[in-house]
Amino acid sequence: MSSLKDKKIAVLAADGYEQSELESPVEALKSEGATVEIISLKSGEIKAMKGHEWSNSVAVDKTVSEAKESDYDALLLPGGVLNPDAVRVDKDAIKFVKDFFSKNKPVAAICHGPQTLINAEVV
């Protein structure tokens, strides 16, 4: 991976994201110099699932209603079962995703993450 210094990545997730599908990519992005912000449907913290059990929490940097695509260079959509079910029906989340596609910015989706792309009608 080339250096991501000076790049800012949005990670859009909600309660029930699969722990490894958020934590591992975030760690990799940060290790390459990227700034990563967690965007969610609510402020505070969101809770991970590890398999079928609730697990770690992560702090939310901004709500999706506050976040703007123009502040980011790329978007990551982690999977999990509960997470995409919430994100894909949120109107602000759908708009946020569509805005990345309208500007031809990179979007990565893991596991069940592409469900949001389907609801946003970008794939």
Q: Would you name each region that the model predicts?
A:
Residues I110-G113:
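Short, thiol/selenol-centered motifs that function as redox-active sites or metal-ligating centers
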